[in-house]
UniProtKB/Swiss-Prot annotation:
UniProt-recorded name of the protein: Global transcriptional regulator CodY
Source organism: Clostridium tetani (strain Massachusetts / E88)
Keyword Iron set for record: no
DNA-binding residues: 204-223
Subcellular localization: Cytoplasm
One cellular component term from this protein's GO annotations in UniProt: cytoplasm
Pfam families: CodY (PF06018), HTH_CodY (PF08222)
Gene Ontology process terms (BP): negative regulation of DNA-templated transcription
Keywords in alphabetical order: Cytoplasm, DNA-binding, Repressor, Transcription, Transcription regulation
Residue numbers spanned by region GAF domain: 1-156
GO terms assigned for molecular function: DNA binding; DNA-binding transcription factor activity; GTP binding
Biological function: DNA-binding global transcriptional regulator which is involved in the adaptive response to starvation and acts by directly or indirectly controlling the expression of numerous genes in response to nutrient availability. During rapid exponential growth, CodY is highly active and represses genes whose products allow adaptation to nutrient depletion.
Assigned protein family: Belongs to the CodY family.
Coiled-coil zones: none
Length: 258
């Protein structure tokens, strides 16, 4: 498929899909790489690689050995990308490595195109395209900028999903805490002080003696939390009970009560 219309229709399929379910950024990269015959990176505002595709088979060793495994571009390079406020196409590396200052680039004839990803009047990230020998055309840039718009919408939606998920987890924890009696709440505070992390071993009898409450109070408190889905517990017999926190908002909400 070579025409601009046909390429746009391919991207529209992703946009239509995004109305019903989240788009995986790697899917966008795979399609863009196929449509534009180039390497593609979607980079967050903080430099994290949200998705990429190197299906052209060509890329410098630094990218393959450092950038891709770490899923992050160097801070100084990401800052340069963020300082680009409009599309810049067919940038040449001038024989120098853009990641390692003072180092020569072993890849020749590499052309880079930078497309800012914006949404809600803020910079959300960068769409980075790399090709060898063949310059990006105006049609390629139209496709790239259109793709950046799609990606921007997806980043905004994923941010909103994160906000909603955090609110849900917080509400679940608050409801679980609300079901505890005063003595159960006191027991819970001591339990997670003893735990000292997201999971660990608890000996209920030791805490009961230390706090001056019955063992049944501790057991009831743990059952309520487990029913709410905020923890997972497993009896290890005489050794005690292994507890794992499933809701990462739990410790934070307990701290607010103190």
């Amino acid at each position: 498929m070579s025409s601009l219309l046909e390429k746009t229709r391919q991207l529209n399929k992703i946009l239509q899909k995004s109305g019903a379910e989240p788009v995986v950024f790697d899917d966008i990269c795979n399609l863009l790489s196929e449509v534009l015959s180039c390497n593609v990176y979607i980079i967050s505002k903080k430099g994290k690689i949200l998705g990429y595709d190197l299906s052209t088979g060509f890329e410098c060793q630094t990218v393959r050995d450092k950038v891709v495994p770490e899923k992050r571009f160097p801070e100084h390079y990401n800052n340069k990308l963020l300082n680009v406020h409009g599309t810049k196409s067919n940038l040449e590396n001038q024989g120098e490595c853009v990641f390692e200052s003072g180092e020569d680039c072993g890849v020749k004839n590499k052309l880079t195109t930078i497309v800012p990803i914006n949404g809600n009047r803020e910079r959300l990230g960068t769409l980075l395209l790399a090709r060898f020998d063949v310059p990006f055309t105006d049609d390629d840039l139209i496709i790239s900028e259109y793709s950046a718009t799609i990606i921007g919408l997806e980043i905004l939606r994923s941010k909103q999903d994160e906000i909603e998920e955090e609110a849900r987890k917080k509400a679940v924890v608050q409801l679980a805490i609300g079901t505890l009696s005063y003595s159960e709440l006191e027991a819970v505070e001591h339990i997670f002080n003893e735990l000292d992390g997201p999971e660990g071993l608890l000996v209920a009898s030791k805490i009961a003696d230390k706090v001056g409450i019955t063992r049944s109070v501790i057991v009831n408190a743990l059952r309520k939390f487990e029913s709410a889905g905020v923890i997972e517990s497993r009896s290890l017999g005489m050794k005690g009970t292994h507890i794992k926190i499933l809701n990462d908002r739990l410790l934070e909400e307990l701290k607010k009560i103190k």
